[in-house]
């Protein structure tokens, strides 16, 4: 899979996005789904919220009105971003992108986060681990919510900036949509020539 690496790029100024959602200087643990469910990790984020320090906040994008009513106050719930740039700003502002999915094939959100210079922390499940290397994030065992948070804290301790260049370089080498389209065309040509 490929993504638009011009749209999903490192945004260096996170002041506006932090002000918009009243995030202050907190470490942002970002989660994103088109529809949140148990399988996408909604319950895992709620559990994680009970373990947060004062300087940490969870930001979840894609939350329904009904889910917003039930989330604890240390989870900032966003229905939808206004545009792709705002999404790239959120990815870039985050200390880590956490994808606690219980089943997924090859989540595009992981690619988008890495392209924006943000390391990914995910469960060892399906294709969610395929874009995560030791330079682009952490993989923890499925259901280990404490392990997810510990990985985020390791990123924060080391300094997210230490991951940014490696994440972006990995995205440029592996996620360019034009390159992936060319790969698909070659594959189709090879199949049809036989």
Predicted regions, residues:
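Short acidic/histidine- and often glycine-rich active-site loop of Leloir-type glycosyltransferases
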Residues: 69, 125-139
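Conserved donor-binding/catalytic core segment of Leloir-type glycosyltransferases
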Residues: 23-40, 46-50
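Nucleotide-activated donor-binding/catalytic signature segment of Leloir-type glycosyltransferases, i.e.
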Residues: 62-85
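Short hydrophobic beta-strand element within catalytic cores of glycosyltransferases
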Residues: 119-122
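A short, well-ordered alpha-helix in the C-terminal region of glycosyltransferases
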Residues: 161-174
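Short alpha-helical donor nucleotide-sugar binding micro-motif in glycosyltransferases
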Residues: 89-94
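Aromatic "clamp/platform" in nucleotide-sugar-dependent glycosyltransferases that forms part
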Residues: 102
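Conserved acidic donor-binding segment of nucleotide-sugar-dependent glycosyltransferases
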Residues: 80, 134, 138-145, 154-160
């Amino acid at each position: 899979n490929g993504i638009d690496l011009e749209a999903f790029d490192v945004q260096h100024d996170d002041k506006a996005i932090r002000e918009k959602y009243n995030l202050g200087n907190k470490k942002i643990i970002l989660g994103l789904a088109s529809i949140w469910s148990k399988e996408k990790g909604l319950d895992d984020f709620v559990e994680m919220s009970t373990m947060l320090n004062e300087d940490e906040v969870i930001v979840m994008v894609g939350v329904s009105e009904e889910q917003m009513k039930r989330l604890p106050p240390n989870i900032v719930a966003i229905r939808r971003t206004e545009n792709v740039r705002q999404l790239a700003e959120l990815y870039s502002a985050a200390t880590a992108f956490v994808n606690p999915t219980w089943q997924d094939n090859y989540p595009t959100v992981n690619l988008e986060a890495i392209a924006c210079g943000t390391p990914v922390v995910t469960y060892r499940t399906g294709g969610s681990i395929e874009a995560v290397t030791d330079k682009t994030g952490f993989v923890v065992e499925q259901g280990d919510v404490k392990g997810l948070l510990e990985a985020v804290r390791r990123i924060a301790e080391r300094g997210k900036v230490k991951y940014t260049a490696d994440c972006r370089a990995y995205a440029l080498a592996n996620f360019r949509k034009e390159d992936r389209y060319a790969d698909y065309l070659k594959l189709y040509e090879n199949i049809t020539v036989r």
